[in-house]
Amino acid sequence: RVCDRIASNPGMPCFTEALDATLSELASRSSMLYRLVFSNLWLTRPLVAKIMASNGETAAMLRTTYALTQLEGSPAHNVLPPAARANFNVRVAPFETVDDAVARARALAVEECLASGVSPDHVTVEIAQAVPYTEPAPISPFENDAAFDYLHRCVSGVYPEAGFAPYVQNSCTDSREFNAICEHVYRFCGFEYSAEARALIHAENERIGVDVYKRGIGFYVAFLANLGQLS
């Protein structure tokens, strides 16, 4: 019951400037109905938040999420466990910290224990020491920014049909190692991924098409060849 309480109560939704910019770009490329919704966030934020919360990928752009990934109890089917353990994968929103996420989980655990008549002392919520973690990366500059505009030009040169907007990357990447030395860290992949291709990332038979690969290489060639424009 504690696990269900935590998983069912993610953080409060918050629209960052980056998310607003993403939705603004979507508005310009959507049908009339979605254009009206995304162009009037001052009115439709509650509706948009509800829609985004219903999808795992977009929910993590909006707020801190908790996904139950492991349960551990008895080592045998006929043995009562002296203790049980659960692990959550937590995606911390850019406007919160790891401590915020842990504190929320602890508070929810206490609430459920008290509601169930169980002493909160029987439940411990802590960060798994064996798993490295980092704070959410800062949002890189994107408004009237030379580096972001350069990336935009490179993308448009290879993918003229594509829209371009900042995006909240909700998974951990090695790019976080550069945050200490540079504020312009953009988590961008120059290859075109369909929903099907994204589902294959880190999965069995992960792959991309040959044409997708060739076009993606063209982006990186253009990106490196014109870096002098930033000097």
For the regions a protein language model found, what residue spans apply to each?
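Basic phosphate/pyrophosphate-binding loop/patch that engages nucleotide-derived ligands
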Residues: R1
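An extended, acidic, His-containing surface patch that forms the Zn2+-binding/catalytic region
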Residues: D4, G11-P75, P82, P94, ...
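Hydrophobic core residues within well-ordered beta-strands of beta-rich domains
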Residues: A84-A86
